[in-house]
Design a protein with these regions (language model features):
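Short, small-residue-biased leader/transition segments that mark boundaries at the very start
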Residues: 2-9
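AAA+ P-loop ATPase catalytic core
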Residues: 10-35, 75-78, 101
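Non-catalytic, well-ordered alpha-helical scaffold segments
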Residues: 11, 21, 25, 36, ...
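The alpha-helix within a helix-turn-helix
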Residues: 14, 84-86
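Winged-helix-like regulatory helical subdomains adjacent to P-loop NTPase cores
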Residues: 32-84
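Short amphipathic alpha-helical interaction segments
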Residues: 89-105
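A short, conserved structural fragment
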Residues: 103-114
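A cross-kingdom feature that marks ATP-driven nucleic-acid transaction machinery
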Residues: 121-258
C-alpha cells in the first residue's frame, strides 16, 4: 500500500469512526480497505453498527434517552440552531437538555462566530462525536431502508454523499489539530448574522495566544476546488467586521495536509 493510499485509508477511517479504536479494529479485522468496503461492512443485516448509536445513548441516558436522541438527530441533519430544533420537536423548550448534552456529556458543541458576544443569537450546534454524527445522518434518517433490509440503496446514498460528509470530518480534524497544538487562545468559524448565506462563511478562524495574529483557513477536500479570489473577499469582510486589529495569516487545508 503506497503512502498516498494509506493516507486516503486513514482519512476514510477517521470520517466514519472519529478515530475510536473499537470501530477501527472492526474494519481492519474484517479486511475493509476502502470507503466502499467499510460502508458495505456496516450495512449487513447482523451488523452491530446499525444499532450502535442507540446502544451508546441508552447506556448514557437510560430510558430517558428519547429527547436527547431527537436533538442529536436534528443537529446531525442540519437543523443546528435552537429555533430550528424547537420547531422540529413541536415547540418544546430545549435549553436545559442542550446544556446537559454539551456540558455533562460532551456530545454537542456550540459554534458561534469568532469574537461574537456570549449571548449572541447566531449560535449553531454540532454533534461533536464523529461516529454519532454519521450514524444519525444515515442510519436514522434512512431507517426505512434498514427496516426493509434494502441495504444496497442505503449503501449507494452513503457512497454518493461521501465527498460532502468527509468534508465535514476534515474540518473537525483540522480544528482538533489546532487545539492540540496549544498555540491558540480561541478557535472557531465565522459567518454573518442569523440567515447566513455560504458566501460569507469561513470554515476555521484561530486567534493565536501570543500576539494579535489570526489564522484564517478554508477547508476543501481537494485543493483544485479552492477559489483564492473568493476566499480573499471573505477575509476582507472578516477583517472589516471583526479582525481589524489582527495580522491575518490565510491557509488552505485539504486532504493533502492530513
Amino acid at each position: 500500500r503506497s503512502s498516498a493510499a494509506s493516507d486516503v485509508y486513514k482519512r476514510q477511517l477517521y470520517t466514519f469512526t472519529g478515530g475510536v479504536p473499537k470501530y477501527i479494529e472492526q474494519f481492519m479485522d474484517n479486511g475493509c480497505t476502502s470507503m466502499e468496503s467499510m460502508v458495505d461492512f456496516m450495512l449487513q443485516p447482523d451488523s452491530s453498527f446499525l444499532t450502535e448509536g442507540q446502544a451508546l445513548l441508552v447506556q448514557e441516558f437510560g430510558k430517558k434517552y428519547g429527547n436527547y436522541f431527537s436533538i442529536l438527530s436534528a443537529v446531525s441533519n442540519g437543523k443546528n440552531t435552537l429555533p430550528e430544533m424547537e420547531t422540529v420537536m413541536g415547540g418544546m423548550s430545549l435549553g436545559g437538555q442542550l446544556k446537559r448534552l454539551e456540558e455533562d456529556y460532551d456530545l454537542i458543541k456550540k459554534k458561534r462566530p469568532i469574537l461574537s458576544k456570549e449571548g449572541s443569537q447566531t449560535v449553531r450546534y454540532e454533534v461533536s462525536d464523529m461516529f454519532l454524527r454519521f450514524w444519525f445522518r444515515y442510519f436514522i434518517k434512512y431507517q426505512n431502508y434498514i427496516e426493509i433490509q434494502n441495504f444496497e440503496c442505503l449503501a449507494d446514498i452513503i457512497k454518493k454523499d461521501y465527498p460532502t460528509f468527509s468534508g465535514l470530518a476534515l474540518e473537525m480534524y483540522f480544528r482538533q489539530q489546532m487545539m492540540e497544538s496549544k498555540e491558540f487562545a480561541s478557535i472557531g468559524a465565522w459567518w454573518q448574522g442569523k440567515n447566513n448565506k455560504d458566501q460569507d462563511e469561513i470554515d476555521i478562524v484561530g486567534l493565536y495566544a501570543e500576539e494579535k495574529k489570526a489564522l484564517v483557513a478554508e477547508v476543501k477536500r481537494q485543493s483544485k476546488n479552492f477559489k483564492p479570489d473568493l476566499f480573499a473577499l471573505k477575509i476582507e469582510e472578516l477583517r472589516k467586521k471583526v479582525l481589524f486589529k489582527y495580522e491575518i495569516e490565510s491557509r488552505l487545508f485539504s486532504m493533502e495536509d492530513m
